Amino acid sequence: NARNGHLFTRFGDLKIRNARHKSDERPIDETCRCYTCAGDGQGGGGFSRAYLHHLERCGEMLAPMLATIHNLHYYLHLMQEVRDALDAGRFGAFRLRFAEDRARGV
């Protein structure tokens, strides 16, 4: 969960406290359009894994706030994809793609 530095992506859970993110300038999820990953389109937001790692390691309150924004957006988007797949009668294909993506890893 966000308060413990766990961020959810379509390719699995990302543990932002891990040292490998110390210099990683990529967003949490390059396909995500949330404020934490992509910003507001006007120069605000769009934080790197390295910056979130730094905030988390320093105990800054902004770290779990940004992680929560991302995680909520992830689940809202995931549930919309589930509803769309069910409505279109292609949930089986969605489920397979979801499992393949998660197995790929972050």
Model feature map: region roles:
Residues N1-V106:
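Alpha/beta catalytic cores of nucleotide-metabolism and tRNA/nucleoside-modifying enzymes
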